[in-house]
Swiss-Prot record:
Record note on quaternary structure: Associates with the 50S ribosomal subunit.
Xref: Gene3D superfamilies: 3.30.300.20, P-loop containing nucleotide triphosphate hydrolases
Protein's UniProt name: GTPase Der
Annotated GTP 2 binding sites: 183-190, 230-234, 295-298
InterPro entries from the UniProt entry: G_ENGA, GTP-bd, GTPase_Der, KH_dom-like, KH_dom-like_a/b, P-loop_NTPase, Small_GTP-bd
Domain EngA-type G, first and last residues per copy: 4-169, 177-352
Assigned protein family: Belongs to the TRAFAC class TrmE-Era-EngA-EngB-Septin-like GTPase superfamily. EngA (Der) GTPase family.
Source organism per UniProt: Microcystis aeruginosa (strain NIES-843 / IAM M-2473)
Function: GTPase that plays an essential role in the late steps of ribosome biogenesis.
Pfam families: KH_dom-like, MMR_HSR1
Length: 452
């Protein structure tokens, strides 16, 4: 069952994201001294007085301006209110009531959701009482003086919040799969997210760089829960200005690290760019499972051999990621989008799989039988004694040999290929650790290892 939602509403730069971070206890929403940083609605898990819920941050509301993304932000706020059990209307206690506050208050009174009024930036109790009194004028209800940055008053606010949450219900335990949607700007990441969730979840615009936050969405398919993380497009460093975009890209890299599977989105019209190659290297470096999602397939003129031609072209560029499943989709039309989660399941299973030592050594024995380890120019041959899996996510196998330097790159790739051929590991990198071990020590451990 989905957790109840608490929406945060207000005009730009009143401290909404700071309040979200205070309640959620994590620095997830971007906080930067520039109005209008949050565009999408972003969800974070929160807990208060034995109650779990989700706190949703929304973009700054402006009603007298239809430029840029402002109409889309209003639409996102309306969606957040529709799914919320209660909303917190945040105002700036230091700046006092503005025309924008009055417009938002009038709009909120028309919505069918309870509203709590949080007067932020009240940095002392005495000051807060005086500042909050002015906001009775908005006719929203009792104003709660708070300091989101220091935490004062937020406990009383949350006490009021949980009174509006529905009764706690048991949530069935189900290990979620965390899926980061990663790619260059404007390759269709947010459109893909919307296609997967079936609703207008993230702001979609033809303007490059619309998504600034890493935003989480929970969806369920056939009993499996997925946490979808949409992120800002990743640009070359020289094209990034210090500020909100810098923090967004940093957040995208963090999203890769906290994911189980990365949907690596590529624009089929652009092919694999140099920036894509660097991004692919970053994903592998973090050891994440991958599904290659080739988007905008609807824009390609096709014949019988088109998909084979494009597959070979992309595989040639991403040869070092040949273990990743590839799927051609159109986020715009929904073509093949539903099959993406099937590939995510396969990649996630491979990513967390553990294989017994006996099975690993069966693979090694068979591999060595077909292709002996190389011999150095000095006539010294490499010996591969045994192996054991030391960790998962990604699968990591320690191989004990007489001298790691006797195993060249070709043979190492051969051994990795044998593990993939015999054990699968579709969609995930695997790491092989080559460890030197004297023969006398091997005699003490090899028999024990092969019986595990």
């Amino acid at each position: 069952m989905k957790l109840p939602v608490v929406a945060i509403i207000g005009r730009p730069n009143v401290g909404k994201s700071t309040l979200v971070n205070r309640i959620a206890g994590d620095q997830q929403a971007i906080v930067f001294d520039q109005p209008g940083i949050t565009r999408d609605r972003t969800y974070q898990p929160a807990f208060w007085c034995d109650r779990d819920f989700q706190i949703v941050d929304t973009g700054g509301l402006v009603f007298n301006d239809d430029s840029e993304f402002l109409p889309l932000i209003r639409e996102q706020a309306l969606i957040a209110l529709a799914e919320a059990s209660v909303a917190i209307f945040v105002v700036d206690g230091q700046g006092g009531i503005t025309a924008g506050d009055r417009e938002i208050a009038a709009w909120l009174r028309q919505q069918n959701v309870p509203i709590l009024l949080a007067v932020n930036k009240c940095e002392s109790v005495e000051q807060g009482i005086l500042q909050a009194t002015e906001f009775w004028e908005l006719a929203i209800g009792e104003p709660f003086p708070i300091s989101a940055i220091h935490g004062s008053g937020t406990g009383e606010l949350l006490d009021a919040v949980i009174k509006y949450l529905p009764p706690a219900a048991e949530i069935p335990e189900n290990e979620e799969i965390k899926v980061a949607i990663i790619g260059r700007p404007n390759v269709g990441k947010s459109s893909l997210l919307n296609a997967l969730t079936g609703q207008q979840r993230a702001i979609v615009s033809p303007i490059s760089g619309t998504t600034r936050d890493s935003i989480d969405t929970l969806i369920e398919r056939e009993g499996q829960v997925y946490r979808l993380i949409d992120t800002a497009g990743i640009r070359r460093k020289k094209n990034v200005d210090y500020g909100a975009e810098f923090f967004s890209i940093n957040r995208a890299f963090k999203a890769i690290r906290r994911s189980d599977v990365v949907l690596f989105v590529i624009d089929v019209l652009d092919g694999v760019t140099e920036q894509d190659l660097k991004l692919a290297g970053r994903i592998i470096e973090e050891g994440r499972a991958v599904v290659l999602v080739v988007n905008k397939w609807d824009a390609v003129e096709k014949d019988t051999y088109t998909i084979n031609t494009y597959t070979k072209m992309l595989q040639d560029r991403l040869y070092f990621m040949d273990w990743a499943e590839m799927i051609f989709v159109s986020a715009m039309t929904g073509q093949r989008v539903t099959k993406i989660l099937e590939l995510v399941d396969i990649a996630a299973e491979s990513h967390r799989r553990r294989v017994s030592t006996s099975v690993i050594n069966d693979v090694i024995e068979e591999a060595v039988k077909w292709h002996n380890p190389p011999t150095t120019r000095g006539g010294k041959q490499g010996k591969l004694y045994y192996g054991t899996q030391v960790s998962s996510q990604p699968p990591t196998i320690a191989l004990f040999v007489n001298d790691p330097q006797r195993f060249n790159d070709n043979y190492r790739r051969y051994i990795e290929g044998q593990f993939r051929q015999q054990l699968g590991f579709k969609g995930t990198p695997i790491r092989l650790i080559w460890r030197g071990k004297p023969a006398r020590e091997v005699e003490k451990t090899v028999n024990r290892a092969t019986k595990v």
